[in-house]
């Protein structure tokens, strides 16, 4: 094994395959061990057969490039299939259209860009604005920064849902997009999508529903009898929806879907250019070259699981999450934020308990349990999935023991995504 000091420059001589793989294997030793069920988020495990079908699809499409589907027509069909299946799950119709992207952030970027371009083309809006809740994903702020939109951010209600009345006061003639979440990430609660969509429609703005977390949970939760308030294309005024297949769709990273209620809406996220020496250039999203690997993996996983497979995984996920919520509420000194009914759980200290939640996170991490950290208030966030099956009971034992002994920490940093 070479020292890291030797890695500042690429070696003159190549290295044997087994040596390279051995070093990569060693590098992983400090990563979270997600396969033991002790990581809440980041990786979503659909089980051995899902691994197998994804790995075989990955080998078949390791080098294929969706930049030009004339060369790889199978990728055009794969994208069409996956988009169509997802649109059907989200109650689209024959007019619903979309594209695959690399993940939820890119899907959100595409939705915001389409809203901005439509606002300019159809409403002559040159100073576009977006209205959202403070619980909406940070990617909307990234999109606003990239594409030059002004963001109006409304506070959440006491139950952490979007405050639609506050949002209504921010909507004006320059509004091109109003955002709702199904569910929102921080506390896992679902916004009032019909009211948000009506608000957008009142000024002829787009309404984007961020279902990156819920797109492959809510359709199946509804099928097993959960009470799901309206959120998808059945809601009048919903223009675009983002849904991540690489989360609770159990496909490998990174693949997501951006759906539009019409093909006319979809055209606003695309870019076409033919005034250069290289010929016709068109791209449906933020990428140029697009790996066929995640697209093929998504197709394979969805075909392998089918509706029944997703129902089973969703049922187990919700059992895990319900068990975690009930267990947390039974531990003195900690509580669950919001009335989330799905798979996202945010755990905070009871007021006046004196518990330092980030110190609690440190104590749980010492026992192998990994959470994201959020504030305000300081809380530990869990994205529960099938991955955590069989681990929740031990988690609750460890949680109770750690709560009883936890101290304090000076580390107040929160985590969702990092630069390096």
Residue ranges and their predicted role:
Residues 162-211:
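Active-site phosphate-binding strand-loop segment of PLP-dependent enzymes
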């Amino acid at each position: 094994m070479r020292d890291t000091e030797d890695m500042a420059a690429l070696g003159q001589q190549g290295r044997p395959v087994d040596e390279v793989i051995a070093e990569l294997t060693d590098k992983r030793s400090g990563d979270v061990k997600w396969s033991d069920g002790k990581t809440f988020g980041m990786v979503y495990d659909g089980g051995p057969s899902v691994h197998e079908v994804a790995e075989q699809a990955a080998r078949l499409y390791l080098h294929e490039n969706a930049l030009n589907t004339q060369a790889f027509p199978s990728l055009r069909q794969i994208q069409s299939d996956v988009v169509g299946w997802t649109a059907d799950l989200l109650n689209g119709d024959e007019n619903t259209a979309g594209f695959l992207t690399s993940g939820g952030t890119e899907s959100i970027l595409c939705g915001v860009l389409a809203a901005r371009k439509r606002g300019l083309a159809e409403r002559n809006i040159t100073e576009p604005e977006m209205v959202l809740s403070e619980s909406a994903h940070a990617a909307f702020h990234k999109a606003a920064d990239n594409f030059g939109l002004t963001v109006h951010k409304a506070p959440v209600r006491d139950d952490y849902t979007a405050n639609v009345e506050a949002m209504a006061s921010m909507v004006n003639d320059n509004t091109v997009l109003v955002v709702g979440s199904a569910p929102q990430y921080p506390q896992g609660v679902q916004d009032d999508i019909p009211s948000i969509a009506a608000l957008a429609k009142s000024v002829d703005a787009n309404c984007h529903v961020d279902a990156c977390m819920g797109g492959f949970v809510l359709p199946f939760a509804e099928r097993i009898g959960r009470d799901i308030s309206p959120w998808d294309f059945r809601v009048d005024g919903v223009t675009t929806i983002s849904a991540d297949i690489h989360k609770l769709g159990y496909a490998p990273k990174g693949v997501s879907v951006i759906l539009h209620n019409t093909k006319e809406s979809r055209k606003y996220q695309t870019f076409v250019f033919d005034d250069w020496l290289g010929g016709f250039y068109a791209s449906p999203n933020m990428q140029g070259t697009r790996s066929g690997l995640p697209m093929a993996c998504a197709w394979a996983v969805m075909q392998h699981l089918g509706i029944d497979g997703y129902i089973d995984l969703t049922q187990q996920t919700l059992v895990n999450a319900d068990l975690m919520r009930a267990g947390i509420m039974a531990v003195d000194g900690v509580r669950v934020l919001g009335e989330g009914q799905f798979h996202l759980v945010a755990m905070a200290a009871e007021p006046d308990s004196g518990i330092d939640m980030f110190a609690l996170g440190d104590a749980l991490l010492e026992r192998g349990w990994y959470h994201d950290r959020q504030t305000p208030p300081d809380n530990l966030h869990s994205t529960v999935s099938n991955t955590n099956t069989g681990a929740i009971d031990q988690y609750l034992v460890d949680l109770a023991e750690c709560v009883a002994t936890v101290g304090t920490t000076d580390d107040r940093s929160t985590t969702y995504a990092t630069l390096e």
